[in-house]
Amino acid sequence: MWPLLLAVALSTLLPLAMPGSAGAVRIKDIATFSGVRDNQLVGYGLVVGLGGTGDKKESVFTVSSMVNMLERMGVAVDPKQLKPKNVASVMVTARMPVSAKPGARLDVTVSSMGDATSLLGGVLLQTPLKGVDGKIYGLAQGSLALGGFSAEGQAARAQKNITTVGLIPGGAIIERGVPFEFNQQDRLTLNLSTADFSTAQQVAERLNAAMGGRYANAVDASTVAMDVPPNYRGNLVPLMASVENIEVAPDAPARVVVDEKTGTVVLGRDVRISRVAVAHGSLQVTVQESQQVSQPAPFSQGQTVVTPQTNVNVREENRRLMMIEGATLQELVDGLNAIGATPRDLISILRAMKAAGALHAELEVI
C-alpha cells in the first residue's frame, strides 16, 4: 500500500514540475530548504617546501609555529636560528555540506597570511579544520595547486595571476559530521533568496496545487512554510526532489542598478519611463601644461628663467531635446540608445529622470 501511495503522490507532483511558461524558474534556483546548508570550516597551518618564497623572519608567528611544531616532534630548536624562507603561515578554509559524513573529502582553499611571495610547489602540513563552535570537523593536508606563477630576478619580476592562494582538491577528510535529523521533520521551510511577497505567495500556491491540499503558506516575504504530507513522513527525499523542481515565475520590484566605478548600467525587466524630454550634452575641459624657457642675451649677465604656461580648452556639445517614453524594456532601450549617450552619461540621465519623477523604478547605486 505504501509504494502505491508514494507513486500516486509523485505522479501528482511531476506534471507541475515540468517546464512551464517563459520566465519560469525552478524553486531550487530561488530558494533553499532551511537547515540544508553548508558549514564554514577554518584552520591555521604551515605550508612547507617553498623555494625561498616563504615568510620572512619578520613574520614572528611563522617562527613561533615552526618552533611549536618541532618541539611536539621532539626536536629542540633555537628560534633565533630559524629562517622560515621555505615555510609560510596560511589560513585553510573549506565548506562542509550538512550531509557530509566521516571519511568524505572536501576541497580546501589555502591563503597566505604572512609576507610570502608565492606558495608554488608547497605542501600543506596536517591542519585541523574547526567550525564556529570550536570543534574539529576535519583534517587538511596535501600539495597545493596554483592557477599562476611568479619568477623574479634582481631587476625584474614576472607574475601571472595570484600566487599566494592555492587549492587542494579533496585535501580535507571529514572526521565528524553535523548531527541533523533530516527525515524526522514534520514541517519544511523554504527561504527565498530574494524577498518578495508576490513570489512567496506564488510558491505557496504552486506547492498546494502540486500536493492537492493546503499544506503550504507564505509566512513573510522570504519564507514559505510547508507541512509534510502523511505519505512522506520519514521519507522526505522524494518530496523535496519534486518540490525543488516545481517552476514558478518570480516577481521583483522594478530596479535600475548602476556601478559608477565601471560605468555599468543594468535595467530590470519591469522598468518603465513616462514621457519625458531629455537633452544631454557632454562638457569637456582640457588643461595642458608646458614650460616656457627664456634665455638671456649673450654676455648680458642675465639668468635663464623658466615660466609655466597653461592652456585651457573647453568644449561643450550642443544637442537637441529628444522625447523618450518606454512602455516595454525594448522601447526603453531604443529610446536611450537614440540619445547616443555613453554608459557614464546614462547614469546621470537616469538620476535626472528619477528626480523628475519619470523613472518608475528603484535606482540603486553600487
From Swiss-Prot:
The disulfide bridges present are: none
Q: Has UniProt tagged this entry with the keyword Iron-sulfur? A: no
Task: Kindly state which keywords UniProt assigns to this record, in alphabetical order.
Answer: Bacterial flagellum, Periplasm, Signal
Quick one: a GO biological-process term for this protein? bacterial-type flagellum-dependent cell motility
Query: Which molecular-function annotation in GO is an example for this chain?
Result: structural molecule activity
Answer whether the UniProt record assigns the keyword Thylakoid to this protein: no
The compartments listed are: Periplasm; Bacterial flagellum basal body
Q: Name one GO cellular component term.
A: outer membrane-bounded periplasmic space
Q: Where is the signal peptide?
A: 1-24
The similarity comment for this entry is: Belongs to the FlgI family.
**HAMAP family xref list:** FlgI (MF_00416)
- PANTHER family hit by this protein: FLAGELLAR P-RING PERIPLASMIC PROTEIN FLGI, FLAGELLAR P-RING PROTEIN
Oligomeric and partner information: The basal body constitutes a major portion of the flagellar organelle and consists of four rings (L,P,S, and M) mounted on a central rod.
Q: What does this protein do?
A: Assembles around the rod to form the L-ring and probably protects the motor/basal body from shearing forces during rotation.
Q: What is this protein called?
A: Flagellar P-ring protein
Q: Which organism is the protein's source?
A: Nitratidesulfovibrio vulgaris (strain ATCC 29579 / DSM 644 / CCUG 34227 / NCIMB 8303 / VKM B-1760 / Hildenborough)
